[in-house]
C-alpha cells in the first residue's frame, strides 16, 4: 500500500482499473466500516501498479465538465500533491495548502496499514508539521484524530454525517457532537 490519493480505497469509481485485464483477479469484496464493498482496493496494489492506472471523475453526473480530463492523469501520491501545492504557492505568491481526509483509518489499522504515521511523516519531511502550516487534516472517525493530536500540531477537523456515528464506534453520535454543551 502506498500513500496514494483517492477519495476511497475502492478505486473502480475513480480510475480505469476495470479496463486492465492484468488486474481482473484482484476484484474482491471486503468489509469496510461494517459494510460489504466490491471492487479493486488500493491496499492490494503496489505504487508502481497504481501508477499504471488513470484517474477519472468520480461523480460525472454532478461534474460533467470534469470528464474531459478522464484518463489524462495518473493517481497522485501525497508527496506529489504537496509538491504541486508548494509549486503553485511559489508561482502565484499565494498560500496553497492541502486538506487531506483520512478515509477508513480503523479499517487500515486493522489490516496493519495505519494511516497516521505516514501522513505525519510526509508533512514533517516538507516542514508542514506545525500549527500554521497550510494543512488541515480531516476525518469522520474520532480515534485517529485523537492519535493525530499526539503526533502533529496541524489543525484537525472532525467531519460528521447527517446521521449515525463515527465508523470507529466512538461516542458520541454525530448528532450529539453537533449539540452545544
Model-derived regions, located:
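Phosphate-group recognition and catalysis centered on beta-loop-alpha active-site segments
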Residues: 1-181
Amino acid at each position: 500500500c502506498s500513500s496514494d490519493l483517492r477519495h476511497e480505497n475502492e478505486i473502480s469509481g475513480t480510475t480505469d482499473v476495470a479496463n486492465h485485464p492484468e488486474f481482473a483477479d484482484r476484484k474482491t469484496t471486503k468489509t469496510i466500516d461494517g459494510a460489504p464493498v466490491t471492487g479493486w482496493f488500493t491496499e492490494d496494489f503496489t505504487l508502481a501498479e497504481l501508477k499504471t492506472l488513470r484517474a477519472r471523475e468520480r461523480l460525472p453526473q454532478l461534474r460533467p465538465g470534469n470528464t474531459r480530463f478522464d484518463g489524462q492523469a495518473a493517481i497522485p501520491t501525497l508527496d506529489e500533491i504537496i509538491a504541486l501545492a508548494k509549486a503553485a504557492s511559489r508561482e502565484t505568491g499565494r498560500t496553497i495548502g492541502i486538506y487531506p481526509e483520512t478515509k477508513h483509518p480503523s479499517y487500515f489499522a486493522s489490516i496493519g496499514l495505519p494511516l497516521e504515521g505516514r501522513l505525519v511523516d510526509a508533512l514533517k519531511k516538507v516542514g508542514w508539521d506545525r500549527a500554521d502550516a497550510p494543512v488541515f487534516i480531516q476525518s469522520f472517525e474520532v480515534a485517529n484524530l485523537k492519535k493525530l493530536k499526539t503526533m502533529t500540531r496541524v489543525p484537525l477537523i472532525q467531519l460528521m454525517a447527517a446521521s449515525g456515528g463515527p465508523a470507529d464506534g466512538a461516542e458520541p453520535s454525530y448528532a450529539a457532537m453537533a449539540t452545544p454543551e
